[in-house]
A protein has these predicted regions:
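Positively charged n-region of N-terminal signal peptides that target proteins for export
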Residues: 1-5
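N-terminal Sec/ER secretory leader and immediately downstream segment
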Residues: 65-76
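Short, small-residue-rich loop/turn micro-motifs
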Residues: 83, 106-110, 163
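Short, surface-exposed glycine/acidic/tryptophan-bearing loops
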Residues: 93-113, 175
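Alpha-helical scaffolds flanking conserved acidic
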Residues: 75-81, 97, 149-157
Length: 240
């Protein structure tokens, strides 16, 4: 099976490197049409089921989240789930590696996005949200050959680990005759990117290692995707 790796013209470094630092303890930090993923309805918080912290973030930034989620074609509750996982709803969260804000934008990513959107201060929560949602859309557009459910999970994995890691896992999945467009195939291939499987890598890549180097953060990335999806599903039930 031959895997077609998309060409990245804009955001090359940002897309490859990702947003979230791998294995980072949150206590240390924190002209073409856009096809819709899911259209967000008006939010109604069921106060008996939603925790106070979530209620507070929706009250403060819900309008901003919904605005940019709709603009870039996402369900706003998915964005809320990403924010919860990234920063635990802490607007001033900052990592040792420099990821900052509600959506934990990494410096390289932030610089590229800020130029594209003419944003001056990504430390402002609303600007940070806009930048993060815009970046998620850029990642989502890389996986147009997958189903929507798989696309969302591949996007989340790329947001966490970088698109380059996901591409390497897709290429390895294809070599193993799995469908590289399915998240389950990529999920199974991610742990195989570590150095302990370098004998396998010699059969896949001319440089005898993954194109973006060995990857030891697969467990964290998989847990990240699982957590965001779990939170998203909960929000779909709790928030209308």
């Amino acid at each position: 099976m031959t895997l077609r790796i998309p060409m990245i013209v804009i955001f090359t470094l940002a897309l490859i490197s990702g947003c979230t630092p791998h294995g980072e303890d949150l206590a240390r930090k924190s002209g073409s049409e856009t096809a819709p993923v899911q259209m967000p309805p008006v939010a109604v918080v069921e106060e008996s089921h939603v925790d106070p912290v979530t209620q507070d973030i929706v009250a403060k930034y819900g309008a901003t989240i919904k605005r940019y989620a709709q603009e870039y074609g996402f369900d706003w509750r998915l964005i809320l789930a990403v924010i919860k996982q990234e920063s635990r709803f802490q607007p001033e969260a900052e990592s040792e590696k420099g990821a900052s804000g509600l959506m934990q934008i990494m410096p390289v990513t932030g610089a590229e996005v800020a130029r594209s959107l003419s944003l001056e201060d990504l430390s402002h929560p609303r600007a940070n949200i806009r930048a993060g949602v815009y970046y998620l859309r850029k990642l989502y557009d890389l996986f147009d050959g997958s189903s929507d459910a798989d696309r969302i999970k591949l996007t989340l994995a790329s947001y966490n680990a970088g698109a380059g890691r996901v591409y390497d896992a897709q290429e390895l999945a294809a070599y193993l005759q799995d469908d590289p467009g399915r998240w389950q195939s990529v999920r199974a291939a991610l742990p195989l990117l570590s150095k302990r499987y370098e004998t396998l890598h010699r059969n896949v890549w001319p440089m005898q290692r993954p194109r973006n180097g060995w990857f030891g953060g697969s467990r964290q990335t998989i847990a990240y995707v699982d957590s965001v999806v779990e939170n998203y599903e909960a929000y779909r039930e709790e928030l209308n």
